[in-house]
Amino acid sequence: MSLTLPFPHRHLLGIAPLAAHEILFLLDEAERWVALNRAAAVKHDDSLAGLTQINAFFENSTRTLLSFEIAGKRLGADVVNMAVAQSSVKKGETLIDTAVTLDAMHADMLVIRHQASGAVQLIADKVDCPVLNAGDGQHEHPTQALLDALTIRRRKGRFEGLVVAICGDIMHSRVARSDIIALQKLGAHVRIVGPSTLIPPHIEALGVEVFHDLDKAISGADVVMMLRLQTERMAGGFIPSLREYHALFGLTVEKLKLAADDVLVMHPGPLNRGVEIDSAVADDLKYSAITEQVEMGVAMRMACLDVLTRQRRAVKGWA
């Protein structure tokens, strides 16, 4: 007997494999966790009670790690954060051996962040439990794209026909890639803008409109998403100086006037104030949804953990 599941994927490794209706299903699932997080005196559910969630972050993180930890704990999971700095990885253990070790411990969920593109897929191929990609190199960051989509839908009520401008360091941003894929699947028109040194070659193949002038890119835009300069991934020479970058590509109050009157300003964090975005814009609650993105992140990750666990139980025939 074959099972028909609303979300038939064993892992969540990227947005690219998902159909639009599957993305919308995850957004709908997240809505009930938004309600729980906002309304409940005790923010706790037993959906993952008795299950073990391991967060293995091979790359530094604050928001994403905390968000996944809170999400797992609110669902009742036993959450373990793997201290990579003190692990056998630092002693030369291969990624595959690490994956086999984690699998032998019978973890029920693995949340992985890694600096190498494709590393999370490599781990997923070696383990029995669901794997969630918390960001791999310059490849994808699916839960960030999902929480961004959730934020946009809650503010705008739709995706079809929206003009979304993604601005900044597109070259090194896995967030940009996942957001582009998700938003286009959902019917939005995506523009990208940045200096030519920070725009990946052939990105037009993803269906985006490319700009090198911020004013033109955000003109009439419904959503403006700013990205930080990922200097930790740069060898140098990508921009002349932070001052010049801000002058050309920093979002100011004056530049924001070029966008739609009800423009939504977003940023995945962390912010570099005075570089890609001015404080006056980031802190303006009329336009800025940056804090709301953080809130939606917990609910969205709760939904992903819950959905993948339910899918596994259905396939395994567990009660």
Swiss-Prot record:
EC category name: transferase
Keywords assigned by UniProt, alphabetized: Pyrimidine biosynthesis, Transferase
Domain of life: Bacteria
Pfam families the UniProt entry points to: OTCace, OTCace_N
Binding residues annotated for L-aspartate, in chain numbering: K91, R174, R228
Membrane listed as a keyword: no
Protein name: Aspartate carbamoyltransferase catalytic subunit
Organism classification: Bacteria, Pseudomonadati, Pseudomonadota, Alphaproteobacteria, Sphingomonadales
Gene name tied to this protein: pyrB
